[in-house]
Amino acid sequence: MIRAHRNAVIAELETRLPGAVFKSYSAAAKAPTVSRYAVVFIGRASKPRTRFTGGQWRDIYTVTVHSVGSDEDLALWVEERVALLTGVKLTVTGRNVWPVEYITGQPLNLDDDGTRPLWFTVSQFDIVSDPA
């Protein structure tokens, strides 16, 4: 189920960043001509009970998106498109997904560890998902 939610996020971001959304940095590295892109990571943040005596049906996923660019402006350009994920109601088969909530972010920073320095910023979102 976690991959279905990740894939829904990637599909939504692809509408704004065609060919520039990846599920890992290794996948992004296979597209070396891309000067700006987003990398999506997802993890289950919690599985709370919706009722005191009920089961743990609800899933809450935290999505972390790295917006990357070859310069500061390109990284921020990607981040502006990633931010539009806020409020979107994703479609995941068999689930009732609530609108995406923006949680937090990190400011623009430089990663100069590699052979080619890249600028990046980080955004985090929560996705609340109930069985349909």
PLM feature segments, named:
Residues 27, 43-47, 68-70, 128-132:
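Generic structural motif
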Residues 50-56, 112-116:
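Short, solvent-exposed beta-strand/turn "edge" segments of beta-rich domains on protein surfaces
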